[in-house]
Structure formats: C-alpha cells, structure tokens
Swiss-Prot record:
Residues 105-118 have a biased composition (Basic and acidic residues). Residues 167-314 form the Cupin type-1 domain. This protein found in the seeds of many leguminous and non-leguminous plants is the source of sulfur-containing amino acids in seed meals. Keywords: Disulfide bond, Seed storage protein, Storage protein. This is Legumin type B. Residues 135-144 have a biased composition (Acidic residues). Hexamer; each subunit is composed of an acidic and a basic chain derived from a single precursor and linked by a disulfide bond. Pfam families: Cupin_1 (PF00190). CDD domains: cupin_11S_legumin_C. It comes from Vicia faba (Broad bean). Transmembrane segments: none annotated. Residues 47-87, 102-155 are annotated as: Disordered. Belongs to the 11S seed storage protein (globulins) family.
Length: 335
C-alpha cells in the first residue's frame, strides 16, 4: 500500500528481484498478489490474477449494493475508462480535472490511456532530485523504531474496566480535516479510543457538503465498510487493473465494501450533502491520498512518469493540492 518508484542512476543495467509476502499481517485481502500502479500503462504482471478478477467483474459488473443509479452516465464513461491499467485510469478525465484542479489535458495524461512505455520509463538527461543524507535517514529510522517499541508503555496503562468506550466523532470541533466549502473528516482509532485496540477496529466520519469531493485515496492496511447515514452522493472504487468495479449513487442506509488498497473517491450530490461512516478492520488504519503522493513525489519523476510539461507538474503539485477535501466550483473560481 506504500507508493514508491525506482531509478537506476548507474552506468550498468539493473536487475531487481522483488519478494511479495502475501502472508504479511498488514495484508487483509487474500494470498493473491496484486500490484497497483498510480501512473503509466503497465503490462499485466500476474495474468492469471487479472483473468480471474475480470471474470468476476464481468459477472457482477459492480458491487451489489443499493440502487444502480446513474447507469446511463456509467455507460457513457465506460469506453474512456477501459483504456490504461493504472488505478487513475478508472476515473474519468472530468472527475480528475475537478479533483486536482487541473486542465483537461493534464487530467487525460494522468489516466495514461495510450502510454506505450509500460512499467519502465527512460529518462532523458537524468533526474534532478534533492536527497537527504544517509545518516539523517538512519537516525529517523532509529527514532521511529524507538517510538514503536515504547508504544503502550507509559506507566499509566488503562485496565479493561476503566477504558473509555464512547467517542463522538461527529462533533464539528472534533474534525481532523476541514474545508469550509467541501466538508470535514474525523477519525477514531486506538490512539484516541484505546479500547479499539482490543477490537482491532477504527472508524472515520465524513461529511461532504453539496458537490463536495473526497479525493481518490486508499486504505494501506485495512478493509473498510462505508455506511451512509444522511444524504446522497456517488462512490467510485477502482481495482488494481484500473477497472471501476463500483460506480453508483448511494443513499441513506446503504452499505459499500471497499477492499484494502482499492482506490475510492466519494462526491456528494447537487441537491444535498453526503454523510457516512467508515468502519475499518485495523485499530490504526492508515490512509494514503493520491494528492499527497503527487506533492511528495519529485517534479522530474512526475514529469517523466506521466509525460507532463513543467507547467503542468507545478499545477498538479501546487495549484491542485489543497487537501483531500475538494469543492470543484470554489477551486475553479479561485484560479
């Protein structure tokens, strides 16, 4: 679930061997290996896995939850979304342009529909990247390991009988992320509600105002169950092959299951907002947002990976990065 890229800055070809540990405790899906690409039009690395998933996708076409609203729009967009094998190819160019506050051409390049370079991209002139010193990286790693080893040993351990068992994450003042035009996000995990450590669960409360968007993101170490408590909106889920396995309207009382590492985005409707709870199967569930990944990725890497001009990279990293909560109309007005 952690995005990464590799660059050979040597004078000789590099052969890398990757070991995929599907039995890792962080993997909550199954023993089937999956590779999720954010960019490019990669070749299929596990063809037997894709064939099996495509058969299921053709049989179900989408997750059997709630009404299948917006079917006409889904059919119109299906042709565009068939191109490309990256996770962003499962979203329409129009939606990506709204989410990242970019031009239509930039959004189309993010989907990489006709990119023939597959997984490996040749960089002309080399990459210009600022790297931290090796000693600094080692010190940061040692500090992280020290903090992990000290977790839960503060001398004031809570007993089962005295554990706090209730937390109101819907309070406005409790919000962890807030956009006055788009909405708010609040989370509860074992750090804020320690009893969740025994249940191995965490929760997220999302409130989206009209037309508000929760930009594409994925859960690194948990499956999740989305339950709509108010309003209506649209949810899109994309798998490792770039297929939109779910793209439907959701309403109050409906459930949607989002598998680990599948990219998901939500948008409230035009008439009313959308409020929902997300229950996650990890007491410290971690979320990665595509926008944050773009901002943390060196400009030269983005330019070469997506075939972008420098102006488009700047637009993507800065103008289009205002947090995971987005209101498309307010962004376009501010430009």
């Amino acid at each position: 679930g952690i995005p990464y890229w590799t660059y050979n800055n040597g004078d000789e070809p590099l052969v890398a061997i990757s070991l995929l540990d599907t039995s890792n405790i962080a993997n909550q899906l199954d023993s089937t290996p999956r590779v999720f690409y954010l960019g490019g039009n990669p070749e299929v690395e596990f063809p037997e896995t894709q064939e099996e998933q495509q058969e299921r996708h053709q049989q179900k076409h989408s997750l059997p939850v709630g009404r299948r609203g917006g079917q006409h729009q889904q059919e119109e967009e299906s042709e565009e979304q068939k191109d490309g094998n990256s996770v962003l190819s499962g979203f329409s160019s129009e939606f990506l342009a709204q989410t990242f506050n970019t031009e239509e051409d930039t959004a189309k390049r993010l989907r990489s529909p006709r990119d023939k370079r597959n997984q490996i991209v040749r960089v002309e002139g080399g990459l210009r990247i600022i790297n931290p010193e090796g000693q600094q990286e080692e010190e940061e790693q040692e500090e992280e390991e020290k903090q992990r080893s000290e977790q839960g040993r503060n001398g004031l351990e809570e007993t089962i009988c005295s554990l706090k068992i209730r937390e109101n994450i819907a309070q406005p003042a409790r919000a962890d992320l807030y956009n006055p035009r788009a909405g708010s996000i609040s989370t509860a995990n074992s750090l804020t509600l320690p009893i969740l450590r025994y249940l191995r669960l965490s929760a997220e409360y999302v409130r989206l105002y009209r037309n508000g968007i929760y930009a594409p993101h994925w859960n690194i170490n948990a499956n999740s169950l989305l339950y709509v408590i108010r309003g209506e909106g649209r949810v899109r889920i994309v798998n490792s092959q770039g297929n939109a396995v779910f793209d439907n309207k959701v309403r109050k009382g409906q459930l949607v299951v989002v598998p680990q590492n599948f990219v998901v985005a939500e948008q409230a409707g035009e008439e009313e907002g959308l409020e929902y709870l997300v229950f996650k199967t990890n007491d410290r569930a971690a979320v990665s947002h595509v926008q944050q990944v773009f901002r943390a990725t060196p400009a030269d890497v983005l330019a070469n990976a997506f075939g972008l001009r420098q102006r488009q990279v700047t637009e993507l990293k800065l103008s289009g990065n205002r947090g995971p909560l987005v209101h498309p109309h307010s962004q376009s007005q501010s430009n």
